Every structure is written in structure tokens, then in C-alpha cells.
Amino acid sequence: MKKIKEAEQRKLRRKKRIKDKIGRGVASRPRITVFKSNRYFYAQVIDDSKGHTIASISTIEKSLNLGKNIDDVKKLGEVLAKRLKEKNINNLIFDRNGYKYHGLIASFATSLREFGINI
């Protein structure tokens, strides 16, 4: 039990360190944050000055019919990039939310970059 609490505390410290470095998202450059559960992958674009979610996407959406593997997360990045282009948002601050920049997180960010979003 002690190891679990220590791991959780390390993750919270990592999240705080990352947030302190990247700053807050504003309307001209909102923050995109990601979350991984055991079954799904979520991402949302947040304007921290207003406290509003501008856009969100996840593999749980029935219309997308995606799973939680690297290829599906790349498709998720493509769909989100198209949604952001419709709203004229091209610049984002990427918040990896304490996760390592590896695997799903890295492929999602790369997919956004490939479709014209500056991170």
C-alpha cells in the first residue's frame, strides 16, 4: 500500500512540475491535455483564462468506433486536428498530464503535428 501511495505522490509532483513549466492556456494558445484509462484515451483542449473546454475527443465516442492502440490514437489526433481547424485553432500548449512522452502520448502529439497543429 505504501508503494502505491508513493507512486501516486510522484505522479502528482510530476504533473505539478509540468504545469508550472508549460503555464496556462489562453484563447490565442489553448492547452491540450490527455488522459489514459485502462480502456480509453481522452484529450481535451482547454482555455484556462475562461475555464472552458473548447474541444474534446475520446476513443469512447460511438461515431469514431476506435480502440486504445497506437493506430487508433493517431486517427483520434487526425479527427481532433480537423475539429480544431474548423474553429481556427492552430497553436496549442501540450500538457502530457504526468505521462511519459512515449507510446500513445507521443503518437497522438505527432499525429496532431502532421495535420498542421503547432505544439
Swiss-Prot record:
Q: Where is this region: Disordered?
A: 1-20
Any Gene Ontology CC annotation: cytosolic large ribosomal subunit
GO molecular function terms listed in the Swiss-Prot or TrEMBL record: 5S rRNA binding; structural constituent of ribosome
Q: Which UniProt keywords apply?
A: Ribonucleoprotein, Ribosomal protein, RNA-binding, rRNA-binding
Top-level taxonomic group = Bacteria
Family assignment from sequence similarity? Belongs to the universal ribosomal protein uL18 family.
Coiled-coil segments on the chain, per record: none
Give the compositionally biased regions (Basic and acidic residues): 1-10
A GO term (biological process) for this protein? Answer: translation
Instruction: Report the Pfam families cross-referenced here.
Output: Ribosomal_L18p
Q: What does this protein do?
A: This is one of the proteins that bind and probably mediate the attachment of the 5S RNA into the large ribosomal subunit, where it forms part of the central protuberance.
State whether it acts alone or in a complex, and with which partners, per the record: Part of the 50S ribosomal subunit; part of the 5S rRNA/L5/L18/L25 subcomplex. Contacts the 5S and 23S rRNAs.
| Name this polypeptide is given | Large ribosomal subunit protein uL18
